[in-house]
Design a protein with these regions (language model features):
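Active-site-proximal beta-alpha core segment in soluble small-molecule metabolic enzymes
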Residues: 1-101, 185
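C-terminal active-site-proximal or functional interface alpha/beta core segments in diverse enzymes
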Residues: 65, 70-208
Length: 208
């Protein structure tokens, strides 16, 4: 739908619209990472061939890059997704599409707390509050993924990790240092293909 809308606007303005495809459906081992964001990677090849090569349906759209957004903050999942994006960019190159950048959505992990003990204390006090041992510390005593069922505290915390052992530039470096099956790492692969890797700094002004 977005391609159709952007095409219509570009035609109306008589301009070329610079676009990046947001893709999803990456594999971590045998597990597929489903997402509400983007085109499924397994369908992208046929979509591009049908709409950009075999017809002029989107002739006012100019491809420049790829983007993906994953839930959570797993370094492994981001590394594997970037690996699959780079592999897909190779396929696109064979079709005449140059990938100038790949954008990793979700942002770089930042530490909003200065000390790990502060994060540990919040986790501890949240569990006490949910168990009605102290006054609520969240709105309406929400458990943020934790809950009491049959008198037992269950679930896992699903809030943003306010303190991390791996954050800032180290978080991105860890992703880019992931080794590929062809030898070398993701950073070297991207550099050899002239692909810029982008990642938003998140709420970096709040970093401790």
């Amino acid at each position: 739908d977005e391609c159709v809308q952007v095409q219509e606007i570009a035609v109306e303005l008589n301009k070329q619209a610079i676009i990046a495809f947001r893709i999803s459906g990456f594999y971590v081992g045998e597990r597929k990472l489903y997402s509400r964001f983007g085109f499924d990677l397994e369908t992208m090849d046929s979509f591009i061939s049908t709409n950009f090569l075999e017809s002029e349906r989107f002739d006012h759209l100019t491809y420049k890059g790829l983007h993906f957004h994953l839930n959570g903050y797993s370094v492994e999942e981001r590394s594997l997704a970037l690996n699959q994006c780079l592999a897909f960019s190779e396929l696109l190159s064979q079709k005449g599409f140059k990938t100038e950048f790949i954008d990793i959505g979700g942002g770089i992990l930042m530490n909003y707390l200065k000390y790990e003990t502060e994060w540990d204390n919040f986790n501890h006090q949240l569990r006490r509050a949910i168990s009605n041992k102290i006054d609520p510390i969240t709105y309406e005593n929400q458990g943020l993924g934790l809950q009491i069922l049959a008198g037992v505290l269950q679930g896992e915390l699903k809030s943003y990790p306010l303190w991390n052992t791996l954050s800032n530039g180290d978080f991105l470096r860890k992703i880019l240092a992931h080794n590929t099956s062809a030898g070398g790492n993701l950073a070297q692969w991207a550099k050899s293909r002239g692909v810029e890797i982008r990642m938003a700094p998140g709420s970096s002004m709040l970093d401790q």
